[in-house]
Amino acid sequence: MQCYTELISPTGVTHALAVPFLSATANNLIVARTSLLQIFSLRDVSLSALDTEVRPAQHRQETCKLVLEREYQLPGTVTDICRVKILKTKSGGDAVLVAFRDAKLSLVEWDPERYGLSTISIHYYERDDMTRSPWASDLSTCGSILSADPGSRCAIFQFGARSLAIIPFHQPGDDLVMDDFGSEPDYENRVEGNSRSHEAKDKDAAEYQTPYASSFVLPLTALDPSVIHPISLAFLYEYREPTFGILYSQVATSHALLHERKDVVFYTVITLDLEQRASTTLLSVTRLPSDLFKVVALPPPVGGSLLIGSNELVHIDQAGKTNAVGVNEFSRQASSFSMTDQSDLALRLENCVVERFSDDNGDLLLALSTGVFALVSFKLDGRSVSGISVRPLSGPSKEFLASTASSSAFLGNGKVFFGSESADSVLLGWSSASSATKKSFSGSTSNDESEDDAYEDDLYSSAPAAMTDNPQNQPSNSSVAAFGDLRIHDRLSSPGPIRDIVLGRSSEASSRDTKDGVLELVAAQGSDEGGTMVIMKREVDPYLVASMAADTANSLWTVSLLPDNNDQKRDYVILSKQEKPDKEESEVFVLEDKLRPITAPEFNPNHELTVEIGTLASKSRVIQVLRNEVRSYDAVWDEDDSDERVAVNATLVDPYLAIIRDDSTLLLLQADDSGDLDEVTLSEDVVSQKWLSACFYSDNAGFFTAPFASILFLLNQDHQLYVYRLPDFAVISVIEGVGCLPPILSTEPPKRSTTRENVLQIAVVELGDSYSSLPFLILRTENDDLVVYKPFFTNSKELTGLRFLKEANHTLPKTPNTTDELQSEMKPLRILPNIAGCSSIFMPGPSAGFIFRASTTSPHFIRLRGGFIKGLGCFDSPDKGFAYLDSHGLHLAKLPEGTQLGYPWIMRTVPIGQQIDKLTYVSASDTYVLGTCQRCEFRLPEDDELHPEWRNEEISFLPEVNQSSLKVVSPKTWSVIDSYPLEPAEHIMVMKTMSLEVSENTHERRDMIVVGTSLARGEDIPSRGCIYVFEVIEVVPDPEQPETNRRLKLIGKEPVKGAVTALSEIGGQGFLIAAQGQKSMVRGLKEDGSLLPVAFMDMQCFVSVIKELKGTGMCIFGDAVKGLWFAGYSEEPYKMSLFAKDLDYLEVLAADFLPDGNKLFIVVADSDCNLYVLQYDPEDPNSSNGDKLLNRSKFHTGNFASTVTLLPRTLVSSERAMSGSDKMDIDNTAPLHQVLVTSHNGSIGLVTCVPEESYRRLSALQSQLTNTLEHPCGLNPRAYRAVESDASAGRGMLDSNLLLQYLDMSKQRKAEIAGRVGATEWEIRADLEAISGGGLGYL
């Protein structure tokens, strides 16, 4: 019984789409990251905050940033997205058609009332009658293509081997081609004057129940009998009827059979008659190059389509005229098609992405698989294309895109987005000067043309007419001028693809962390020259600058004060030390080079309890709110002595101070110009209310009302949230039902509100970075739950349209133990205006942590490492870090340089400049050893006696192979301190750190780095391998670089026949086992450096994974053909014995053990993104006396796994609390192991064993959530996960992504679901904490 939890969602961008989605005039970017759908808006910001990314020549320009609006975890894998303009949408913008794996389509729109997606329809094409042919390929093994007509008249979805689904869309009137539904898709050029009124469109929409007509499925052979092997298709521009071009072949293309199947590709243009469900072939072009793989439709002024091949580009216009250019010397050898020769460019077009970057000309930006950009220009002769030219982009293009692009989107105004699965995705742009340069080459349309010619000029830009004098050079010159100002607007960072992971000792300078055994997860990320080390942690682990003892202190505040004499700003830290239950002493420290105590006799002389400390009067006065008085640093305002009310909550924003007293009344003070405080007279409506909490918000951006207004949020005892504008105290809005915690807070009370949460504090705070900070409403409950709401307006920012959308927060607070309960009372939330460049909020207490948000991410909670945090405060300058108070004392700390706060885990990246395939950590030397590779040219060996003709090979465009090397990285500076190159064409297949026996006499054991390599020189030559044994030794360092005191020393080298594909430590005598060729051999290291074989096992195929259950001798062998083998190793005598096999022949990519009590499970990841749980149970009758591994369950993750690693599991807070309260020994029920799964798309998952009782509760909860929740895009989580289990003893794996959505429900819905499940809410919360990653307590 296991549960799969996705700790980090997929990060690699697979698809991108530019569309006006939130409104008709919006500029949005929709990004798909495998199963994560994100909706961004483009926001222009001034360059005053951007000094690092923009060059001085562009200081007068604005830059553009991506701001995340919403994101959705989809129970499905996105395969394509396209935009569709339908009759009527809720937002007025376009709709989006999303294609999923297994032939599903969802039509979605934006709903401004809910500020989220609304599913219009979902279309399934996976029925048996669609693929009932017994020899047809399975849908999961076939690709799919989605394309929409530019006029939004229909969309086509090619799925399976040769099936085509056509979905017609209703359009206004009988004529489908109208001005506002024209063939030009660019929303920035949409015609303003519509020929029909909006009322007429609404009338047309009312005539149809759905925006689409009935779809139908045809085989491709029904359109053209010769379409046997489809390659690519796309709808074309400038056709009155829906028309698409399809690239196909009648026989399968093959590079190996090129001499027989040369130029066998066809290109056909087919127009559709949607009413008659018929088609007509307009033109067909034959004998095209066999390496063509993609069709790109080109808008005016070029028109037609661009066919992309591995070695050439081919343009075909509307009349079937072809123009081609070859970009390497193989274009002539691979094809006889007529083309222009540009073979001197030596470009490789595999996996390239092409996108236009301007509306003024037809030039295209080509992103190659290496990250290099090239410019594709068309020679226009009037309306006809007479030639193509390609020009590589000179300059540091690697700074823009580090590796292969996977998708692209043109966003208008000189902005192009390139998504990547193997590097950061980038938003590129050009300066306005370059746009003017390009426009200078465009001619103007003469005024005496006819109306028909004017309409054609809308389709065909007049730019080519001005280029006819020098058609070859002018487009290139304008484009080169444009590229001179190329720059990066924004990035979407990605820690994927994750190729390998290792655990290492934390590199932070914190001595107590080392004692606590804090580790960090280091991953090898990126491809090609974008290789990077990523350091990940679950919690904020700050760098301690200074510490001091403060045993009796229980609260902390930080203030930055501006002296009256305009002297330099000074930062202070104020501690409160409790003397008695109602008395405390305040100590003041000034922050200089270190904390220096100062004498402040007037500061809290009566030793009252402090409620809040802040500044007013433009930071010239320090205000201290005590229980019975409010004090300024030189002026005091005292309450009436006869008034025994005391302050319990305070909030302040210049020049106001609001205090909630113990009788739930409000006291409002205002500071005058001199800093003195005066009481503000309140209206009777405010005085008569009983208030629970108050919070000020300075609306500098004018989100709620006029800019620079002060907004006061008040929560009363009926859980109504009043929003007031000061100084006139006008009511902006009254939000109902706050205590019910519904998904959307509004002025309407919730329908079912019998159950409420006890909300103790509210806070409205800006969250974000320097590019985008937005206000959020934070609610803190009595259980330390933080509920985050995002405000939005439903109708043009009218006050009645103010609503709050609940953001997902799946971090559960820790259950306090006995020690924590003895700590001081609940500390209020602390607003942090600037911490590491981000505005944030901090929650003290046993579950202390921050809520961070970046412009491209949603708010998320990250804990601060440590125990009970009593208080934390930051300073005005982020360079000074922050101060916090815990049980160890007072600390000044900073976040490590380069820390990324945009993910649920803390991350830092260390660029290496080469692709990192493997990495390992050496604890003895505290270093990391990397196995990197770089591309190098490959020549056939000239000394081969069997092939003397290879010596006569004449080729300049050589193939490339990987050449590996080893690098030593010091975590002190995260720099490479040593390197060891391997032979040419030698590639590292596996690398691990092992404790090996180095002496047969003394039996001494030391940590060694064992490397297995493969030396492949081509298909005709058998591969060889080698086993290297290295040790990291200590040497004399460079005096200026003390971290260079480590070097690699080669201890042994053992060449073997066959590639070394897997390694593992085995047994208890310091031996290793290596998979070499088709054998797995146990070897021991001798003193002379040789590796002596002692036992072996014959394998049928090349082994991809070997794992040993440490110290037991039990190991697994896995490969992609013969499945998984479970074997054992004995030392007396040395022997390998086969125990059991997987008879299902799984395609094993990665695997590891998962012990659960007295049960032994094996987790296997296959090539179809599935996880299998196998069990070795010889007592089960189905195991054939233990010869068969039992397949207990199957679970579809949707992520292509790269590693599966067994890790120890720590107890979560609820388990520790139960073990502490119950004197019985119940630790046996808590699982002690878990498996971490990393993927190529950057996601990280966790497989956790679940006890029987918890499994029953969670399984019932999952069933309830599957049936009751509204799933995005209308998908079915049960069908997506495709859970299969052994009916006799197996249990299906649980889906934590679905289970954790229970936390996002309202209080009433939680109580109802818990009642149906038959459990209490506390039991469900404890179960969810156990599966949500809390067992990784050492990270």
Curated annotation (Swiss-Prot):
GO terms for biological process: mRNA processing. Keywords: mRNA processing, Nucleus, RNA-binding. Residues 436-455 are annotated as: Disordered. One of its GO terms (molecular function) is RNA binding. The keyword Nucleus applies. Residues 436-446 have a biased composition (Low complexity). It comes from the Eukaryota. Pfam families: Beta-prop_RSE1_1st, CPSF_A. Transmembrane segments: none annotated. The keyword Nucleus applies. GO terms for cellular component: mRNA cleavage and polyadenylation specificity factor complex; nucleus. It is found in: Nucleus. Belongs to the CFT1 family. RNA-binding component of the cleavage and polyadenylation factor (CPF) complex, which plays a key role in polyadenylation-dependent pre-mRNA 3'-end formation and cooperates with cleavage factors including the CFIA complex and NAB4/CFIB. Involved in poly(A) site recognition. May be involved in coupling transcription termination and mRNA 3'-end formation. This is Protein cft1.
